[in-house]
Amino acid sequence: MALPNQQNVDLPTFKLLIVGDGGTGKTTFLKRHLTGEFEHNTEPTLGVDIYPLDFFTNRGKIRFECWDTAGQEKYSGLKDAYYIHGQCAIIMFDVTARHTYMNIDRWYRDLRRVCKNIPIVLCGNKVDVPSRQIKPKHVSYHRKKCLQYYEMSAKNNCNFEKPFLYLARRIAGDAKLSFVESPEAQIDNLDVESLQLLTVEAGTQPLLMTRISFEFNTLSIE
């Protein structure tokens, strides 16, 4: 479950680069995670926008610092500076626009030139649109480069969190890592009577401080 940015000095944070041609839905995808709303019309990204997205996992809370880069060619000279110290990436194309798929090799080569061996996910967005031009049988680039591939839709939540989960597992080196509900969401699901009983009981108990350790294997960036 993704949550908006919350201040936490000790929170494990990983720089995620999201790249692809303009209009593929990168910003809409991130804002969908951030706000829960689907924005039909978003302004083109100018340079880069950064969105901190928090997820609760079975090993603790983590944050992806998502660098949403501009897809327009006029900003191409700035890409290398944005990519420095990237730890994982998503390459997005639009299944309704053939040229965005044809350009993914350029985005891949740019990432590899700066970030070397970081885990990368390829995402085909807008699968909810009936008039798609790139069918599943046409998508083969990920097999050539040994990338994980997901067909997704920011509009109807198809494979909504899978790119983040895959990248979290790769960075953690833990194939069993899973996303869980936030503690806040679990409390909201309690009925009123149970919540009142817990509140009364808590008032009679001494305060205990606990600490959850969380260790991730970070990738070395050459």
Swiss-Prot record:
The keyword Transport applies. It is found in: Nucleus. SUPFAM superfamilies: P-loop containing nucleoside triphosphate hydrolases (SSF52540). It comes from the Eukaryota. GO terms for biological process: nucleocytoplasmic transport; protein transport. GO terms for cellular component: nucleus. Residues 71-87 are annotated as: Switch-II. Residues 40-48 are annotated as: Switch-I. Pfam families: Ras. Disulfide bonds: none annotated. GTP binds at residues 21-28, 71, 125-128, 153-155. Keywords: GTP-binding, Nucleotide-binding, Nucleus, Protein transport, Transport. GO terms for molecular function: GTP binding; GTPase activity. The keyword GTP-binding applies. InterPro entries: P-loop_NTPase, Ran_GTPase, Small_GTP-bd, Small_GTPase. Residues 10-174 form the Small GTPase Ran-type domain. Belongs to the small GTPase superfamily. Ran family. Found in a nuclear export complex with RanGTP, exportin and pre-miRNA. NCBIfam families: small_GTP. PANTHER family: GTP-BINDING NUCLEAR PROTEIN RAN-4 (PTHR24071:SF26), RAN GTPASE (PTHR24071). GTP-binding protein involved in nucleocytoplasmic transport. Required for the import of protein into the nucleus and also for RNA export. Involved in chromatin condensation and control of cell cycle. This is GTP-binding nuclear protein Ran-4. The gene is RAN4.
